[in-house]
């Protein structure tokens, strides 16, 4: 499987370190790619496979912010291909406008209002978009997160050796549905070795040749079995590739019907 390296000029980056909670984009893209990054107290790995094209509707972004804080965003625009790719790029532009909002729920609220108003004014209607965003404090190990109708992230507890779903009760609307939506956030404490796995719904809705959907539960089990069979210490890039291969194996030999993006974080130390 080949991945295209995303050059820095593909997306314009904005440095805002002079402002409170100033964030600098380290990487963002909606193209086929595999990228690993080191942040304050955190490892990050992103692997993305658009369906039927080199770019699609999944946008992933990683920011380094002040106070040893890292921010990650994964957005999934309805559909795939050229139109969804344009929507993903629009979401990316909005991220730069609001990237310095510290609160994850506040970030989603601002994104949603602007996105919805833009959709109402645009001759080409923007599509509904799900988003998950999180901030990790490298000093305390606290991970704050919020959803806009996005699939639940998975939390790997290294000590217990199992994955858990994150965000019970966070039932918020996607971007573009209605202005004024109030989003909620939760937090979890990460210990060294703990991981966060965010993904687009293409990873859970993939169907076998017989028509059986992998489902969120099946994806969780696949993630656990994938991690169990990799020799330790597990490298995040190896885990991402092996998990993606597992998703593709469920699909069979045919191409994936939807964009698939996996964004994995692990607390270091």
Residue ranges of model-derived segments:
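… and, occasionally, acidic/histidine-rich disordered N-termini of signaling adaptors
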Residues: 3-197, 252-269
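C-terminal catalytic subdomain
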Residues: 5, 132, 186-198, 203-269
């Amino acid at each position: 499987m080949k991945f295209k390296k995303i050059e820095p000029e593909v997306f314009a980056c904005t440095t805002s370190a002079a402002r409170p909670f100033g964030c600098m984009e380290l990487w963002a893209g909606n193209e086929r790619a595999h990228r690993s990054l080191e942040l304050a107290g955190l490892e990050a790995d992103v692997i993305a496979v658009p369906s039927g094209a080199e770019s699609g509707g999944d946008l992933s972004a990683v920011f380094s912010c002040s106070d040893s804080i890292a921010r990650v965003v994964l957005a999934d625009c309805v559909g795939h291909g050229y139109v969804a790719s344009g929507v993903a790029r629009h979401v990316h532009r909005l991220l730069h406008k609001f990237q310095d909002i510290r609160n994850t729920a506040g970030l989603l609220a601002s994104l949603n209002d602007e996105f919805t108003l833009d959709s109402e004014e645009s001759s080409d209607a923007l599509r509904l978009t799900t988003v998950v965003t999180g901030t990790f404090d490298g000093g305390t190990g606290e991970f704050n997160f919020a959803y806009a109708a996005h699939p639940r992230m998975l939390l790997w507890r290294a000590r217990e050796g199992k994955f858990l779903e994150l965000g019970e009760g966070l039932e918020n609307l996607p971007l573009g549905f209605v202005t004024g939506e109030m989003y909620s956030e939760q937090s979890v404490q990460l210990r060294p070795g703990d991981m966060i796995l965010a993904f687009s719904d293409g990873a859970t809705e993939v169907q076998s040749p017989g028509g059986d959907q992998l489902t969120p539960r099946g994806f969780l089990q696949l993630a656990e079995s994938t991690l169990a069979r990799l020799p330790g210490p597990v490298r995040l890039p190896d885990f991402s590739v092996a998990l993606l291969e597992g998703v593709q194996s469920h699909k069979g030999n045919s191409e994936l019907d939807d964009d698939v993006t996996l964004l994995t974080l692990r607390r270091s130390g």
